[in-house]
Amino acid sequence: MVRVNRENRSTFLRVKCPDCENEQVVFERASTVVECTVCGRILAEPHGGKADIKAEIMAVLE
């Protein structure tokens, strides 16, 4: 029997809002629109699997 190691293929991202420079964590495969908690700008939109990130990615969290 072959055992397959599954890696987590989705990650959390720390992004910076281009308007107010607030940093927050978003899921790479977000299924809903993610807005900045400070100014309300859209940071990520769902796009058939992976989200379309509209902010600067600061770090990939493990």
Swiss-Prot record:
Cofactor(s) listed in the protein's UniProt record: Zn(2+)
Family of the protein in this entry: Belongs to the eukaryotic ribosomal protein eS27 family.
Any one Gene Ontology molecular-function term assigned to this protein's record: zinc ion binding
Oligomeric form and interacting partners: Part of the 30S ribosomal subunit.
The protein, known as: Small ribosomal subunit protein eS27
Zn finger intervals (C4-type): 17-39
InterPro entries in UniProt: Ribosomal_eS27 (IPR000592), Ribosomal_eS27_Zn-bd_dom_sf (IPR023407), Ribosomal_zn-bd (IPR011332)
Record bears the keyword Cell wall biogenesis/degradation: no
Sequence positions that bind Zn(2+): C17, C20, C36, C39
Keywords: Metal-binding, Ribonucleoprotein, Ribosomal protein, Zinc, Zinc-finger
Cofactor, free-text remark: Binds 1 zinc ion per subunit.
GO cellular component, one term: ribonucleoprotein complex
One BP annotation, GO: translation
